[in-house]
Amino acid sequence: MKKNKIEHYSDKEALDFHTNDKSGKIEIVSSKPMTTKRDLALAYSPGVAAPVKAIADNPELAYEYTTKGNLVAVISNGSAILGLGNLGAIASKPVMEGKAVLFKRFADIDSIDLEIDSEDTKEIINSIKSIAKSFGGINLEDIAAPNCFIIEDELKKILDIPVFHDDQHGTAIITTAALINAVDI
């Protein structure tokens, strides 16, 4: 059985990768053509009035008329960055952008990274609660224990969208897959 070779990269290569062409790893692009004045008017004003009124009458229509159903917030405070520790919210941004890229590449799910500059559990919960209606799901990432468990549990109680705690659930999924594969051997 051939083992996969782990490739190593220099810090310079990694930094160059993050700055070539455009800084960072994600961008927002229109899902509709924006080539005419009519397109622009439909995309913004006055064209947004019809979906705005429809969603005001029935908030579930946000899943039909907006990106909400295919949009995940990847959220961290940078207090437990894998292999690096507590380096803070903004330092976690490359990791969260990387997670957003993985969502897009492997599941065609759009995601936005959000870094919350706080280690106060209640403040983090309230911050996420205040923006959650814009998203179809929340992915918590690199938040130190035990706060990560408290935050996840509380968000699951108060939000009506899925909350995925990547460090906990992702590890459980990988461990289960490894055990299943070990049984097959």
Q: How should these model regions be labeled?
A:
Residues F164-I173:
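Active-site nucleophile and cofactor-binding loops and adjacent substrate-binding regions
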